[in-house]
From Swiss-Prot:
Membrane topology note: Peripheral membrane protein
The organism of origin for this protein: Mus musculus (Mouse)
Keyword vocabulary terms for this entry: ATP-binding, Cell projection, Chaperone, Cytoplasm, Cytoplasmic vesicle, Cytoskeleton, Endoplasmic reticulum, Glycoprotein, Hydrolase, Membrane, Nucleotide-binding, Nucleus, Signal, Synapse, Synaptosome
GO MF terms held by the record: ATP binding; ATP hydrolysis activity; ATP-dependent protein folding chaperone; cytoskeletal protein binding; identical protein binding; kinesin binding; misfolded protein binding
Residues linked to a glycan: 144, 159
Outcome of gene disruption: Animals fail to feed or vocalize and die within 48 hours of birth. At 18 dpc, the global structure of the central nervous system is normal. However, at the cellular level, nuclear envelope abnormalities, with membranous vesicle-appearing structures in the perinuclear space, are observed in multiple areas of the central nervous system, including neurons of the spinal cord, pons, frontal cortex, and hippocampus.
SS bond list: none
The protein, known as: Torsin-1A
Keyword Endoplasmic reticulum: yes
Root EC class: hydrolase
InterPro entries linked: P-loop_NTPase, TOR1A_C, Torsin, Torsin_1/2
A biological process term (GO) from this entry: synaptic vesicle membrane organization
């Protein structure tokens, strides 16, 4: 998370946006500044991003981005496309949209959240209205969990007050201290208003490795049965995935009221990636760097990756996460 775009702009026109790394005292000071420019929204928007400037979501553009940038994830792409486009087209949603993305490292969870943000705000993850929390960075100490709960509620309340269509992304949910995330339960529930603030248009996205074993088991069973992974349906995954995450003591969702009260709209499985998907990632990366696609280099990079299970060697250990650094070695030759 970042501070203001410039010190001068912050002093003159500072929006009431509370950053995860900002002191709470700063947010209180900014509330006073708000009154000096509240009557001049057009003037303010000449200098900084405004909530009202959010993009009008194009379902076709979102689908194109998902198809061109997210590989091997037919379930995730369908759920994200329908959930996000449907939510944003609803002028009066009953509750915030909550997506919980699950899968191994390198399968595309962070990338999917980036795509969502970019299709709603031009600045994407750098937008003033998109807020990223990383469990090990922002909530490192179990002894401070009570303080974290209070701060988290204040940060979310302040940001949604400034922009109803705020997006909150919680990464490393599997490393978050159990019970902490329950602090935001009132904001995710079916309330019109909580303490004079409506959260119904906000979006909450949770990213986690929890449940990845269950996802792999289903994908491997389909592979052993000679079925295509595209035949896997959400119903084959979602119920067992929710139970697995709820009962995982190493997950921030362990016995969470968010799951118990059915406040997570979708548990989105990200399947482990196969050899062919790694080649897709490498191919797109070469194109994005302006290199001519070289299938020989693509194959060499993909073959350097390690695969599991030990016997079958079907799925990439790290997904597409490290293929880009390995690509550097061959491009420098």
């Amino acid at each position: 998370m970042k501070l203001g775009r410039a010190a001068l702009a912050l002093l003159l026109l500072a929006p009431c946006v509370v950053r995860a790394v900002e002191p709470i005292s700063l947010s209180l000071a900014l509330a006073g500044v708000l009154t000096t420019y509240i009557s001049y929204p057009r003037l303010y928007c000449l200098f900084a991003e405004c909530c009202g400037q959010m993009r009008s979501l194009s379902r076709e553009a979102l689908q194109k981005d998902l198809d061109n940038k997210l590989f091997g994830q037919h379930l995730a792409k369908k759920v994200i496309l329908n959930a996000v486009s449907g939510f944003l087209s609803n002028p009066k949603p009953k509750k915030p949209l909550t997506l919980s993305l699950h899968g191994w490292t390198g399968t595309g969870k962070n990338f999917a959240s980036k795509i969502i943000a970019e299709n709603i705000y031009e600045g994407g993850l750098n937008s003033d209205y998109v807020h990223l929390f990383v469990a090990t960075l922002h909530f490192p100490h179990a002894s401070n969990i009570t303080q974290y709960k209070d701060q988290l509620q204040m940060w979310i309340r302040g940001n949604v007050s400034a922009c109803a269509r705020s997006i909150f992304i919680f990464d490393e949910m599997d490393k978050m201290h159990a019970g902490l995330i329950d602090a935001i339960k009132p904001f995710l529930d079916y309330y019109d208003v909580v303490d004079e603030v409506s959260y119904q248009k906000a979006i909450f996205i949770f990213l986690s490795n929890a449940g990845a074993e269950r996802i792999t088991d289903v994908a491997l069973d389909f592979w052993k049965s000679g079925k295509q992974r595209e035949e896997i349906k959400l119903r084959d995954m979602e119920p067992a995935l929710a139970v697995s995450v709820f009962n995982n003591k190493n997950s921030g969702f362990w016995h969470s009221s968010l799951i118990d009260r059915n406040l997570i709209d979708y548990f989105v499985p990200f399947l482990p990636l196969e050899y062919k998907h790694l080649k897709m990632c490498i191919r797109v990366e070469m194109q994005s760097r302006g290199y001519e696609v070289d299938e020989d280099i693509i194959s060499k990079v993909a073959e350097e990756m390690t695969f599991f299970p030990k016997e079958e060697k079907v799925f990439s250990d790290k997904g597409c996460k490290t293929v880009f650094t390995k690509l550097d070695y061959y491009l420098d030759d």
